[in-house]
């Protein structure tokens, strides 16, 4: 299973359950191998020859690229399963340090002077592209918002980004373990994972507008 960065724990559990189900039906044991990284980077790896029986990436566009550039998937892959072959949805939230010292409540607070942002690189990370789209949507929905203002807002976000890791899990590590940045733009599950692993150190902030992410 070639998957995107923050799904290690999820697919470890899914694989365990599916392995038991498959053996009960067929008597066969399955050997699972997981590969995780930024979604765009993983798509390129499959296109370049990385073996995969299953791909579970962050964006439909990444799987489209595999379908377009290889013979591994049909171009109408989204029609093969219900819900456009999207098994679950998620969203983007902010993870801040305990007490929220920079008073970050919404997207507009991210570009205040002195706020250091952690988000992955949208060139390699699917989660980063969902972050980008959520920020764009918020800016465009403000009074007088338009594409030009949304573009300028997103530019400011990246100007105040301290580290651009290649994937979402790398960004979580940078923020939670290395202690860099004031706010992490995160998948919902990554934010909850950080709080569970380091209780008492972080808080989740839900912005007034986010995005319905549909990883296929």
Label the predicted regions:
Residues 142-208:
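Ligand-binding pocket segment of bilobal, Venus flytrap-like solute-binding proteins
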Residues 105-107, 128-133, 196, 216:
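A short secondary-structure junction signal
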Residues 99, 115, 140, 159-162:
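A broad detector of the eukaryotic-type serine/threonine protein kinase catalytic domain
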């Amino acid at each position: 299973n070639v998957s995107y960065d923050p799904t290690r724990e999820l697919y470890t559990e899914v694989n365990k359950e599916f392995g038991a189900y498959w053996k009960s039906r067929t008597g066969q044991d399955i050997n699972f191998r997981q590969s995780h990284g930024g979604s765009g980077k993983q798509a390129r790896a499959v296109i370049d020859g990385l073996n995969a029986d299953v791909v579970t990436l962050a964006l439909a566009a990444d799987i489209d690229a595999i379908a377009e550039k290889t013979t591994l998937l049909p171009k109408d892959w989204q029609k093969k399963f219900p819900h456009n072959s999207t098994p679950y949805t998620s969203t983007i939230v902010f993870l801040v340090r305990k007490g929220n010292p920079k008073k970050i409540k919404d997207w507009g607070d991210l570009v205040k002077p002195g706020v250091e942002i952690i988000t992955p690189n949208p060139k390699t990370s699917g989660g980063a592209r969902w972050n980008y789209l959520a920020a764009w949507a918020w800016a465009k929905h403000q009074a007088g918002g338009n594409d030009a203002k949304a573009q300028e807002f997103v530019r400011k976000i990246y100007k105040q980004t301290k580290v651009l890791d290649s994937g979402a899990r790398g960004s979580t590590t940078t923020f939670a373990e290395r202690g860099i940045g004031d706010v992490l733009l995160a998948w919902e599950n990554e934010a909850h994972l950080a709080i569970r692993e380091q209780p008492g150190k972080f808080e989740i902030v839900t912005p007034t507008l986010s995005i319905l992410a549909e990883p296929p």
